[in-house]
Amino acid sequence: MKEKSCGCIILKDNTVLLIGAKDDAGKLFWSFPKGYQENGETDIETAIRETKEETNLDVKIIDDESITTGHLIHGGTAYKEILLFIAKPLNGEIKIQEDEVEKAKWVKINEASKYFDGYYSDVWKKLLDRLKYLKIDAS
């Protein structure tokens, strides 16, 4: 079984927006705003909608090519594919969706990988490579 989730890696002034949520055991983990597609949505439409729902931010996708990762879920019985699109905020103040998100914060891009304990570690290499390709400074 395969599931798909789409979201945004939001960049602003050499920082990235991380959201904190709790796992089934109640432990806080860091991630990006993302969620499941609704009927008929494209991957990018899902990413923009989920970002708005979870953070109240309107975003502009700055790269149509997703950074893709994934992991096993449901006790290893399904694979969750995660497509993340690089975006920038257009307007809005962060207001978290309290039933899904515990907190949100801007973190320097070059310090953000320490928030993941191996989870999303592949995303950071892909993100830095992509930023270099797009000529976006991540220092």
Predicted regions and their residues:
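Charged phosphate-binding loop/patch that engages nucleotide di/tri-phosphates or the phosphate backbone
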Residues: 114, 118-139
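Short low-complexity stretches enriched in small and charged residues
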Residues: 14-19, 37-44, 59-65, 127-131, ...
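Unchanged
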Residues: 37-61, 68-123
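N-terminal strand-loop-strand
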Residues: 1-32, 59, 63
